[in-house]
Amino acid sequence: MTRLIRNSVILLKIDAVYGEDAAPSGAGDALLASNLSINPLNAQNQSRDVIRQFLGNSEQLVGTRYKEVGFDLELVGSGTPGTPPAWGKALRACGFAETILATTRVDYTPISTSFESACIYWYDDGVLHKLFGARGTA
């Protein structure tokens, strides 16, 4: 059955504990995104190049498994000075620190340690994909 991209929703919430379900929900965790793509099962297989007495290929063992998602976000402000935009959580999961200057502005600066991670719920036209401990690139 065909899935319609217009029936997709992405919810993102910063993890309190890495790799655990942060349970994103509602409009507060929804992202306005475009150019959505998802690969629900990527794997890095480990080859077994064993020498055998007969012809044939060697089996591969499934190694690291992971999900990969991609999307574009519009960089628009929240509309209120000193209030983080909706996409700020996604930027924090991409290795940026958020600094809120009350009633003035919100700044984002790259960091090299203490990266945050996010929990992403991707509703793909009735199919729910959950990603725990997600980190990205911007």
Residue ranges and their predicted role:
Residues 1-138:
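Signature of extracytoplasmic/envelope-associated structural regions
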